[in-house]
Amino acid sequence: MADRYILAVESSCDETSVAVLKNEKDLLSNIIASQVESHKRFGGVVPEVASRHHVEVVTLCIKDALSEAGIVAEQLDAVAVTYGPGLVGALLVGMAAAKAFAWAHGLPLIPVNHMAGHLMAAREVQELEYPLLALLVSGGHTELVYVSEPGNYKIVGETRDDAVGEAYDKVGRVMGLTYPAGREIDELAHKGKDVYDFPRAMIKEDHLEFSFSGLKSAFINLHHNAEQKGEVLVTEDLCASFQAAVLDILLAKTKKALERYPVKTLVVAGGVAANQGLRERLAEEITDVDVVIPPLRLCGDNAGMIALAAAIECDKKHFADLDLNAKPSLAFAGFEE
């Protein structure tokens, strides 16, 4: 049987990425052009700046991905692209590039949900056993997803307000940390102690929804009150206390979901899945199911994960026409026309 090659494009936020996947899960290349330095001074992603950067580098990323993979366009079997959720301008740049490439080379177009990409990045670690449960944690999303079979997703719990990654960045900004703040808070937390009493919203309630706005507000209020009184707070202890509250919430809801949905596999994915504290707590507290976490290089936004999700859609022949539009608020579901 001939090898199958998929070119994947990801541009939903502030990373321009293009990857080439051979067959089901052999990533031959995964080019990532990060914009972090451009957004640091703003303390967050500026949509217009992100879009302009995507325009500047997406064509070069495609060229580099093919070159690193050691193949030419004529060997490709399909082109995959993130069509949501994300920043509409950023999505449109990647989609325009992917659609133009697909049209020019007569290739079918595979639309991929960005969050499905995060989840399916776990396929590179091992073959996933279905049904499974996934905890997806990133800058824009915090959700528990039940996956009955490949490509069939159902949200069973999600945040009512801030995503967990968003909360990290906001408290990091208050402390004067560099954007994005997640890694630095995690490192500082390992040097501090959980001495500040932050709220764990809805942790004892039976539903599977999350809330981080109260925790974020409590943190900001404590920090501002200390500043006004001239009190000195220990940054390491602040980070340790904040992270302990976040992880208590995530673990409590995940355990409830595992009780409600008996599965053998838990996938934990998204940018926040790179958090060392989260990985440690998962290893300590969830031992009765197989916990699968993508490697660090596939936790943040990248086209490799989009290609891994696209392979499943390609198997099902879920292709889109070239009039496919960006869906910045795309709901997590199966294939959407």
Swiss-Prot record:
GO BP field: tRNA threonylcarbamoyladenosine modification
Recorded catalytic activity of this chain's protein: L-threonylcarbamoyladenylate + adenosine(37) in tRNA = N(6)-L-threonylcarbamoyladenosine(37) in tRNA + AMP + H(+)
EC number: 2.3.1.234
InterPro entries: ATPase_NBD, Gcp-like_dom, KAE1/TsaD, Peptidase_M22_CS, TsaD
Primary localisation category: cytoplasm
Enzyme class: transferase
Binding site for substrate: 136-140, 169, 182, 186, 275
Record carries keyword Acyltransferase: yes
Pfam families per the UniProt record, alphabetical: TsaD
GO molecular function: iron ion binding; N(6)-L-threonylcarbamoyladenine synthase activity
One cellular component (GO) term of this entry: cytoplasm
Details of cofactor binding: Binds 1 Fe(2+) ion per subunit.
Highest taxon above the source species: Bacteria
Keyword list, A-Z: Acyltransferase, Cytoplasm, Iron, Metal-binding, Transferase, tRNA processing
Keyword NADP tagged: no
Location(s), subcellular: Cytoplasm
Cofactor(s) essential for the protein: Fe(2+)
Signal peptide: none
Binding-site positions, Fe cation: 114, 118, 301
Physiological role: Required for the formation of a threonylcarbamoyl group on adenosine at position 37 (t(6)A37) in tRNAs that read codons beginning with adenine. Is involved in the transfer of the threonylcarbamoyl moiety of threonylcarbamoyl-AMP (TC-AMP) to the N6 group of A37, together with TsaE and TsaB. TsaD likely plays a direct catalytic role in this reaction.
Similarity comment: Belongs to the KAE1 / TsaD family.
The protein's name: tRNA N6-adenosine threonylcarbamoyltransferase
